[in-house]
Amino acid sequence: MKRAPTKQPAKPAARGGERAQGRVIAAHGRHYIVAPADGGSMLQCFPRGKKSEVAVGDRVAYERTSADQGVIVEIGERRNLLYRSDQFKSKLFAANLDQLLIVLATEPYFSEDLLGRALIAAEANELKPIVVLNKIDVEAALPVARERLAPYRALGYDVLELSVKGAPDDARAQLAPRLAGHSTILLGQSGMGKSTLVNLLVPDAEAATREISAALNSGRHTTTFTRLYPLQDGGALIDSPGFQEFGLYHLTEGRLERAFPEFRPLLAHCRFYNCHHLHEPGCAILEALADGRIAPTRHALYAQLVHEASQIVR
């Protein structure tokens, strides 16, 4: 008499050693928080090997090593990648972005150098840049801020004027449609109102930060990690600290010159094909600088970035 076949139990999902898919939503050192693609609880992951090449926003494959930990075994193809860099090293920190949102304010006085660098990063990575001028209710400082931003408006950059604290509903109405469905990196100096803006757009941001901080074992007061917040209308907001460390040392000179939109129509008109646009005769960029078509501050930024890039060994 034949025995009835034994019924096999259902196969459990994502057990230890089995691969699963997810997205990196926070990073601190070599510690990463991954949100599983199937909607399960987030887990702390570490990269396989000594070198850490993972960025917030990466789509990854991971293998669980315990109920709440895993190891990242593969990184999906990236659309783009942003770096934080100085002359000694470059560290990737955000990937798969659509937009770059820079928060400025009427006061304190914002750094035009940092604004310029952020815009160059956006152009070099084909991200849509959005400039926010916050605290427009500080009326005494508003005319000067507008005057400083006028050259950027003339270059075609969006500048949104709002007051996150004074008129939060208006701020949300301006920003929400622009962020919906897109992955946006948020940058801003201290004092510009970036944290207030995050809390406006992501109501549970503080709770999420505490949860991620605890999961990273980085201390309850630690907020110096890049993190991704899903948005209610789709898309995501990536908040990264340390705007001052934002560098462009990894860009080649060719990518750098094309990241200035006012340079691009002129590049083919320089006398020399390998023109550096610094002191060469017959340079179309220098001619445009001399007759006022290119702002001196923009060319000075270009020259500074070329100098910085020349100081490192590639």
Swiss-Prot record:
Cofactor entry: Zn(2+)
Alphabetized UniProt keyword annotations: Cytoplasm, GTP-binding, Hydrolase, Metal-binding, Nucleotide-binding, Ribosome biogenesis, RNA-binding, rRNA-binding, Zinc
Localization per Swiss-Prot or TrEMBL: Cytoplasm
Superkingdom assignment: Bacteria
Cofactor: how and how many bound: Binds 1 zinc ion per subunit.
EC number(s) on file: 3.6.1.-
Record-linked PROSITE patterns: ENGC_GTPASE, G_CP
Stretches for region Disordered: 1-20
InterPro entries hit by this protein: G_CP_dom, NA-bd_OB-fold, P-loop_NTPase, Ribosome_biogen_GTPase_RsgA, RsgA_GTPase_dom, RsgA_N
Domain CP-type G: start-end pairs: 85-246
One GO CC term on file: cytoplasm
Alphabetized Gene3D superfamilies for the sequence: Nucleic acid-binding proteins, P-loop containing nucleotide triphosphate hydrolases, Probable gtpase engc, domain 3
SUPFAM superfamilies documented for this protein: Nucleic acid-binding proteins, P-loop containing nucleoside triphosphate hydrolases
Binding-site residues for GTP, renumbered to this chain: N134, K135, I136, D137, G188, Q189, S190, G191, M192, G193, K194, S195, T196
Binding of Zn(2+), residues: C270, C275, H277, C283
Molecular function terms, GO-annotated: GTP binding; GTPase activity; metal ion binding; rRNA binding
GO biological process annotation, one example: ribosomal small subunit biogenesis
HAMAP family: GTPase_RsgA
Role summary: One of several proteins that assist in the late maturation steps of the functional core of the 30S ribosomal subunit. Helps release RbfA from mature subunits. May play a role in the assembly of ribosomal proteins into the subunit. Circularly permuted GTPase that catalyzes slow GTP hydrolysis, GTPase activity is stimulated by the 30S ribosomal subunit.
Family to which the UniProt record says this protein belongs: Belongs to the TRAFAC class YlqF/YawG GTPase family. RsgA subfamily.
Assembly notes: Monomer. Associates with 30S ribosomal subunit, binds 16S rRNA.
Name of the molecule in the record: Small ribosomal subunit biogenesis GTPase RsgA
Species in which this protein is naturally found: Burkholderia pseudomallei (strain K96243)
